[in-house]
Amino acid sequence: MTPDETFVELRDGRFKIRVLSAGEGDPVVFLHGAGGLFWDPFLDAIAAGHRVVAPEHPGAGDSQGLEHVEDLWDLVLYYNELLDHLELPRVSLLGHSFGGMVAAEIAATSPERVDKLALIAPIGLWLDEHPIPDISGVPPERIPELVLADPQGPLAALMPAPDPSNPESLFRAAMTMASILQFIWPLPDKGLAKRLYRVKAPTLLVWGGQDRLVDPAYGDAFASAIPGARLEVIDGAGHLPQLEQGERTTAVVTEFLG
């Protein structure tokens, strides 16, 4: 499935945001992680039964407006504006990693606009016994070791990566990473843990059993903090269960979304 690509402008052109969308049915908004926005077979499968809308974070890829977002709260307000602009007053939110953190913040601070909440290996909490590494200092060639259960497997070769011989490609990848990392650190100070009790939407948490970036212990922490949340651990997957164990992850998420 080839998604539609549009650019949305907000605040008199201060934001110019790339949005991918496909499918029909109840809306599901997908918020991507630090690796950037890519349409993959997982989103294809979700779009088979829903209207999937996937906006790119400001400053990532081809999207502009990062300079108008100072902190995480600014980002949450921005996403509420974007949903209003897209005429999506109530949606299901599907977020991966950093996108999961943002989705959880939206569900906690604007519970009336979230129908269901599906979080795949979200960040946002901190456990001293399982510190999350700062990937800004990790060489690109070592990323598969952190995010894949099998860093030598075929998926490692397919992971999107900048062309080391192309300065523009390297710059865009660095900007995408920087546009997201600025909202993450210092992670313990963001305060999500004290807001998760406000989530009212039915919540699904999906975690790779071999996640070396965000330890599966965080799945238990999120499940304990969000009322009624359900945790599904996918064996044989790391931080990208929707890609590494796509069939099982897709089945769990599509069953939850209905």
Regions of interest found by a model, annotated:
Residues 2-4, 165-194, 198:
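Hydrophobic, aromatic-rich cap/lid helix
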Residues 12-62:
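Conserved HGGG/HGGXW glycine-rich cap/lid loop of the alpha/beta-hydrolase fold
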Residues 12-13, 53-94, 243, 251:
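Active-site loop/oxyanion-hole signature of alpha/beta-hydrolase fold enzymes
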Residues 95, 99, 103:
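Gly/Ala-rich beta-loop-alpha elbow adjacent to hydrolase catalytic centers
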Residues 104-109, 115-146:
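Flexible "cap/lid" loop of the alpha/beta hydrolase fold
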Residues 199, 205-207:
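Short beta-strand/loop motif that positions the catalytic acidic residue
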Residues 210-214:
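Acidic catalytic loop of the alpha/beta-hydrolase fold
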Residues 229-258:
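Catalytic active-site module of serine/aspartate enzymes centered on a nucleophile-bearing elbow/loop
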